[in-house]
Amino acid sequence: MNKTVVRCLLSRSHHPLIHFSTNLSLLHRVFTCSRYLTARFMSTPPPDDMFGFDDPFSPSDSREVVDLTKEYSFLHDSLVDYGNVNVHQVVPIITQSSIDARAIADAVSGVDDVFGRKSQKFLRQFREKLSESLVIEVLRLIARPSAVISFFVWAGRQIGYKHTAPVYNALVDLIVRDDDEKVPEEFLQQIRDDDKEVFGEFLNVLVRKHCRNGSFSIALEELGRLKDFRFRPSRSTYNCLIQAFLKADRLDSASLIHREMSLANLRMDGFTLRCFAYSLCKVGKWREALTLVETENFVPDTVFYTKLISGLCEASLFEEAMDFLNRMRATSCLPNVVTYSTLLCGCLNKKQLGRCKRVLNMMMMEGCYPSPKIFNSLVHAYCTSGDHSYAYKLLKKMVKCGHMPGYVVYNILIGSICGDKDSLNCDLLDLAEKAYSEMLAAGVVLNKINVSSFTRCLCSAGKYEKAFSVIREMIGQGFIPDTSTYSKVLNYLCNASKMELAFLLFEEMKRGGLVADVYTYTIMVDSFCKAGLIEQARKWFNEMREVGCTPNVVTYTALIHAYLKAKKVSYANELFETMLSEGCLPNIVTYSALIDGHCKAGQVEKACQIFERMCGSKDVPDVDMYFKQYDDNSERPNVVTYGALLDGFCKSHRVEEARKLLDAMSMEGCEPNQIVYDALIDGLCKVGKLDEAQEVKTEMSEHGFPATLYTYSSLIDRYFKVKRQDLASKVLSKMLENSCAPNVVIYTEMIDGLCKVGKTDEAYKLMQMMEEKGCQPNVVTYTAMIDGFGMIGKIETCLELLERMGSKGVAPNYVTYRVLIDHCCKNGALDVAHNLLEEMKQTHWPTHTAGYRKVIEGFNKEFIESLGLLDEIGQDDTAPFLSVYRLLIDNLIKAQRLEMALRLLEEVATFSATLVDYSSTYNSLIESLCLANKVETAFQLFSEMTKKGVIPEMQSFCSLIKGLFRNSKISEALLLLDFISHMVCPL
């Protein structure tokens, strides 16, 4: 580049110094400074910082060009000040040699005859100055090819100077511009006529150039011409030809050249011989390679054997490659780290992972350690093959070799384990966690893809707290998660119903300065809606609008659906209007959600009207608000839409209409899916139409849908309800025949059914069997079993089961305590019942129904109803404790344990301001106190009762009057009687 700039500067004048009339010493300082800048701009120093000792002609030099213009702007300014040099150009280096080269080039280029008297006279002054660099520079400055040849010939004639290989190469490069271009005959003739020796060397150089360029045909033609002129190819030419053919995998051609070379009594150099031996081994001819060594009288060294081993690995001759290690040792030529690494990489490239283990152990025993890059490749290979255990061991081997595992290898291992959803198991996840802990200790982070995969695996294994902490730990190590990473982790937590952790992570995300997008907000809104936490979902909905994040149709649909399921139809309609006003049009999912939501809100007729309008009916005015933006070209009902309405019919026991809708689906070309069939079968079972349910099951099978656990569960549950255990057993046998193992729901239904018909021992055996088969009972199973033993009076067994629940990690819920306390009361174990109530309070159960609805999830409606809890659960703001207290107080009154009953009633008053539902309890307790001659206590309770808003029954007044008479308090009795008469018949 410097020479090009020099040429531009000097082409303006015949004399190179015409533009530099200022102080020469100052100019020299400027150019010295610019020389440093030029070196800095053109390349970066080599790794050892020994600038100037790197080979500028090395083909492997791939150093980056670093732009330091800004950093050294002050030096550019100084150049402008002193020399008026353009700061955007690299300042050339002017030397005496450059001046001479320009002078010679101008002289030669300006004349037709270089060998004329005038030219010879001018050039004579430069004879003693001729050198390799000067000649090359002149050749590059001369424009005309003929003049280039003339100067080349003239320079070769001068005493004290002889052309070198770089000069020949420069000449060939100037004459042959294209790789496939031949040298013009006139140029060859000119060189030949002048100096045959130079001509012969020139032809050799020409052959080598075409070999390096891969132009084999031209190289062979030039070789033929060289021979035609009775010149011998040089050793370098033969070596270059052989190397070129070997590089092109033309082993036969290389062999022919070698045979000719041998006939000329020439030997290959060491590099060419190694390449030849490698190529022979690569095609399995390793014996020929050894013969070649003997023929060439070459003494093999470590580099040579390493090359042979590399070729044998390419040929998949691994046993032979291993044998060459022994050959090396036999010749006192020890394998080094390059040898072992070559063998190791060769086995690795051919997927010979078993041999890799053997080679790795051998080389480490001999103190030869693979590089971190090779370790990374090994870990990747073993992870790909599924041997994650050995991949983890390689991390330990890295440490033994002095290499600390870093970012790449940890991400390879953890990413491979967590990236394969199908093969993941507990052992592999434990291994990933172990590697993750070590990675944290080393201060290394996962990339965002592997953070998402790792947290997904942790969530799937139920390790939600660990998944939640991963983000925080990664941030602590310098990892900066983006919105996408947070969204994926939030989605995993929400899908696992870990709403509290999702809430905390979402808030942490916002505190970190990240702005949630519509996708993230929609995940949170949809998940919290499905969990019944509508108020929080609405807060986020409002928040996203405030921060300028426009909700999409999915966001609106999730919230509308939640409002409808919560029977807040007005809120849903208002939100639907907002959606339309914001220009967000409902889609088929929205309308399907409307139908499902209205069904769950008990408005099946409204759902039918929406469905009719979707089908094209215009005479349905009551649902106009939902169809302001709906036209005939909009999407028709799909299988989800049909399924939502069909499920609504079944849940409201309108199974005939559900059956007709199923037929209508098929007529409209909408094929029912598994979910639709299962919903209809469950609906038919619920109303006792078991024969029709079996018919639908048969139809389902004919359409290619095998019975599922849900199908079998519906049938088994109903058969037990109608006390047809024989048919339930047949369904169970059919399940097992179809390799459909019962789950905890089916086992629980069977256990509950057996308990209901008094077969408690059989139910208990079934529960033991399900544990043996690896299906662990849940809280519903234990509660059903406790209820069964309670019905036959085995309270001790019930308590043992409660204790067993704790040891198994199954927490009892409200229904469990309610069932057990009820049976304790019925069997007279009032103290035990009271202790259970205290235990229930101490475990921090919620005080209102809204907080414990999720607690009873999993129990079917019939079971809850059989315990008398259905009405309690349906009333908002009713404390779940109150029913348990009432149950226990009533039984204490019957047992005449009035003091404890009074104390519990006082406790009840702390939970609720109004005790209207306790009217009968108050009246019973007043009557019992009067019968026990505790009239004063009865009057105090009467006073508290009226203050709480509980209206006394006439029986309470009668009990109080009788009690007063028995205690000879006649006047008080008459006053109370007078009060009653005025209350009943006011004046």
Swiss-Prot record:
PPR repeats lie at residues 164-198, 199-233, 234-268, 269-299, 301-335, 336-370, 371-405, 406-446, 447-481, 482-516, 517-551, 552-586, 587-621, 638-672, 673-707, 708-742, 743-777, 778-812, 813-847, 881-915, 918-952, 953-987. Coiled coil: none annotated. Keywords: Mitochondrion, Repeat, Transit peptide. It is found in: Mitochondrion. NCBIfam families: PPR (TIGR00756). Belongs to the PPR family. P subfamily. This is Pentatricopeptide repeat-containing protein At1g06710, mitochondrial.
